[in-house]
């Protein structure tokens, strides 16, 4: 049985405001496009994209409780900012709520976990989510157009 994207969308929407949900939709569109270019299952990329910010608005205490003892190599750093912590907390929240999201694929969970900071030896899916988050259509930073073009040619540049 495949991933139920509609179920993921419905449940993710419960945790995000409208502005953040629109961002997630744009990330999903960018991730799907990149997945098709790099021969990654589009379903995995879309699922990871919809899930990547699920913990964005969790209270800091909840985020810390979700990750405590699981990531000692980054635990001191991640507790300092929700911008980093929400990826790790989101991965654990998804893992702990299989009934809600239907995801236990470690590659998808890693893509959620590392979407803000990256990691060594990232999978192609993780690179796609990392980049899709940065280059989605709502982003307007200097150089984003060039980054969008480059992402379609090489995920490692």
State where each predicted segment sits.
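N-terminal glycine-rich anion-binding loops that anchor highly charged ligand groups
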Residues: 23
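Non-catalytic interface/linker regions that flank or bridge core catalytic/transmembrane domains
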Residues: 1-2
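Divalent metal-dependent catalytic cores for phosphoryl transfer on phosphate-bearing substrates
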Residues: 9-15, 34-156
């Amino acid at each position: 049985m495949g991933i139920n994207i509609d179920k993921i969308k419905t449940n993710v929407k419960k945790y995000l405001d409208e502005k953040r949900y629109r961002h997630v939709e744009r990330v999903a569109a960018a991730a799907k496009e990149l997945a098709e270019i790099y021969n990654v299952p589009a379903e995995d990329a879309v699922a990871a994209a919809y899930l990547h910010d699920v913990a964005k608005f969790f209270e800091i205490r909840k985020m810390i409780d979700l990750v405590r003892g699981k990531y000692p190599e980054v635990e001191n750093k991640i507790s300092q900012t929700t911008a980093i912590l929400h990826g790790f907390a989101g991965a654990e929240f998804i893992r702990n709520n299989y009934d809600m999201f239907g995801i236990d694929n470690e590659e998808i969970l890693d893509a959620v976990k590392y979407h803000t900071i990256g990691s060594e030896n990232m999978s192609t899916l993780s690179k796609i989510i990392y980049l899709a988050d940065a280059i989605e259509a709502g982003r307007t930073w200097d150089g984003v157009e060039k980054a969008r073009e480059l992402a379609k040619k090489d995920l490692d540049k």
